[in-house]
Each structure stands twice: as C-alpha cells, then as structure tokens.
Curated annotation (Swiss-Prot):
The gene is ubiE. This is Ubiquinone/menaquinone biosynthesis C-methyltransferase UbiE. Belongs to the class I-like SAM-binding methyltransferase superfamily. MenG/UbiE family. It is an enzyme of class 2 (transferase). Keywords: Menaquinone biosynthesis, Methyltransferase, S-adenosyl-L-methionine, Transferase, Ubiquinone biosynthesis. It holds the Pfam family Ubie_methyltran. Pathway: Quinol/quinone metabolism; menaquinone biosynthesis; menaquinol from 1,4-dihydroxy-2-naphthoate: step 2/2; Cofactor biosynthesis; ubiquinone biosynthesis. S-adenosyl-L-methionine binds at residues 75, 96, 123-124. Disulfide bonds: none annotated. Methyltransferase required for the conversion of demethylmenaquinol (DMKH2) to menaquinol (MKH2) and the conversion of 2-polyprenyl-6-methoxy-1,4-benzoquinol (DDMQH2) to 2-polyprenyl-3-methyl-6-methoxy-1,4-benzoquinol (DMQH2).
Length: 252
C-alpha cells in the first residue's frame, strides 16, 4: 500500500481505503457465475496447470490429518484439487468474503467430499478462526484484491501452526523480452472484450487486469511475506513470469 494510509489502489484508480473492499465485492458478485469459464478463456486453460503446480507444491498428506485453509477460494477450485490429492483425513476450509462466490462453490461441491470441506464467509484481514489451527494456507489469485495485504499476511501467520506453510499463487510481472508486450496487448485489449462478451461485464475485467499491474514485484512481495514473520521465503515464476507461486514457512 502507498504511503497515504487513507487511500489505496483499485486498478489504476485511487479510492478511499474503506471503499475498496466493497468495490471488489461488487466485481466478484458480478462475475461469480462465469468466473471459472472466464479463467479458461483468459488463460487458454493455463490456469489449470498453474493450480496443479500449486497443489504439487502443497503436497497434502495422504496418510495423516491435514488441515488446509484456502482463502479467497469461493468457487472451490483449489479446495477440490487439494482434496483429490490428499488422503481421507485431508480437510479444507474455504473462506471467502463474497457470498456469490461461496454459493458457486457450495453448488459445485454438492455431496462430494462430505465432512471434508466447509465454506466460511470471512475477511482475509480478520479471519474468524483460532490461532494455530491449520497445517497450510493457500490463496490463489486473491491477495492482490485485499485492501491491506500486510494484514492478510499477518492473519495467515497467526492461523498456521508451527511448521505450517503459506502458499500464494498470483499474477506477476512477465520477464521474457517480447512476451511482455504481447501479454500487455492481450490483457488490455482482449480480456475486457471477453469479459463483455461472455460475462456481460467489461469494467470488472478491466479492473482485474489493472490490479495485476499494480501488484508488487516478486521481490517486493517476498519482503512483505518475511515482514509477516515467515521464514525460507521463495518464489517460482511460471509461464515466463505471467504468474508466480510464493512460499513461506511458520517456523515457531
């Protein structure tokens, strides 16, 4: 967040800090029903490989109890993958601030994974969960929408038990010469058009593209993760830097 503590980025605009969450909620309420379809269209299906890479890094236990908190995971995409990869004692709590996204997730879950998944309404900056209650915390393509990222990271640290792991999958900054220009042209010209055509909402997808550009560089975000108390902080760039997996451990 910028030095001005009363305002923050909303895409390329500056808005009062206390207004951002409401605006973000409206974006995701608008796109919830088409969210996963749009992810396929926007990424050409690559988001599936990126999420698989996140689950491979997570490695949920197949032989012992494993408790995962997936934040901003309303539609259940990460949760379902983790449950399929883990053992019978893997349990996922999906937390999202947006009721429309949670409704999609509950509908998709149906009767699958009975007793192994729950959906909770909550704010990443003030998790309604006890200290040290999870083995791992994941957040995929969500942390850039949080008004106070440092608070979300502090909350992630709080709810993890010692030895727990923080994993964040987020869009990043393309580092391949030539690809950066192609990616920018695609992002700013094509994605909002797809949003208008498929989801009936050009402006929400324009915000999502702009929010990617405002997100910190991998090095800067690593510094924020370390400031929250995490150790052994690393990141791995995917697809030429289009996105990255960030990792940190709670040692004590």
């Amino acid at each position: 967040m910028a030095a001005d503590e009363t305002s923050t980025d909303f895409g390329f605009a500056r808005v009062p800090l206390d207004e951002k969450q409401g605006r973000v909620n409206e974006v995701f309420r608008s796109v919830a029903r088409r969210y996963d379809v749009m992810n396929d269209l926007m990424s050409g299906g690559l988001h599936r490989a990126w999420k698989s890479a996140l689950i491979s890094a997570l490695r949920p236990s197949r032989t012992r109890p494993f408790r995962l908190l997936d934040v901003a995971g309303g539609t259940g995409d990460i949760a379902f993958r983790a449950l399929q990869a883990g053992g019978p004692e893997t349990h996922v709590t999906v937390l999202d601030i947006n009721d429309a996204m949670l409704a999609v997730g509950r509908e998709r879950a149906g009767d699958r994974f009975a007793g192994r998944i729950d959906f909770v309404a909550g704010n990443a900056e003030a998790l309604p969960l006890p200290d040290g209650s999870f083995d791992a915390y994941t957040i995929a393509f969500g942390i850039r929408n949080v008004p106070r990222i440092e608070r979300a990271l502090a909350e992630a640290y709080r709810v993890l038990q010692p030895g727990g792991r923080f994993l964040c999958l987020e869009f990043s900054h393309v580092d391949v010469p030539g690809l950066d220009r192609i990616y920018d042209a695609y992002s700013f010209r094509i994605i909002p058009h797809l949003g208008a055509l498929v989801a009936g909402d050009r402006e929400s997808y324009r915000y999502l593209v702009e929010s990617i550009r405002r997100f910190p560089t991998p090095g800067a975000f690593a510094g924020m993760i370390e400031e929250a108390g995490f150790a052994h902080v690393t990141h791995r760039l995917l697809s030429g830097g289009i996105c990255a997996i960030h990792s940190g451990w709670k040692i004590a």
